[in-house]
Amino acid sequence: MEILLYTGLGVGLIFASEIGGYIWHRYGAHTDILPFVKDTHQVHHTRIHDQAHGDFFYIAILLVLYLAFLFYLYYLTYISLVLLTILYLGVFFPFIWSYYIHSAYHITDHWLNDYEWFQNDKRIHFKHHEDPTKNYGIATHFTDELLGTFDYAFPINKNIEK
């Protein structure tokens, strides 16, 4: 029974991470709530080969703070190390996946360009660069579909294939 609980928690955290990434991208990187983040992100939108390392740097800082919070929680409550690990990895791995996929979108000769699913995701991503009110998802777009910001229309810039 414990394995089901931990599995459910891990899957839930993956979904929560994706929703958190959407919120960060939509409201952190595209509004004036955090102007320094918006400024960094706008540079990314104007350079096709900019991999947005600055944006991900801020998120990496949040991951370190989250880990510190979990250890503090562990210290206060003595929750199991298994649970602590799931709570961290369920957020950490989706971040790493998003970072990798997003960087690959901006690398001309990336090996993933050989796959149609990646080419489609890349088009969706670059559509966001043309219309910053659409397609906030990075590695998945279920949150965009859920919240009405998904647009599959291909971007005008056809120079993104490879």
Task: For each feature predicted by the language model, list its residue ranges.
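Alpha-helical transmembrane segments of multipass membrane proteins
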Residues: 67-72
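Cytosolic/stromal cytosol-facing helical appendages immediately following the last transmembrane segment
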Residues: 2-8, 12-58, 73-78, 83-84, ...
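Short hydrophobic alpha-helical membrane-embedded segments
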Residues: 58-64
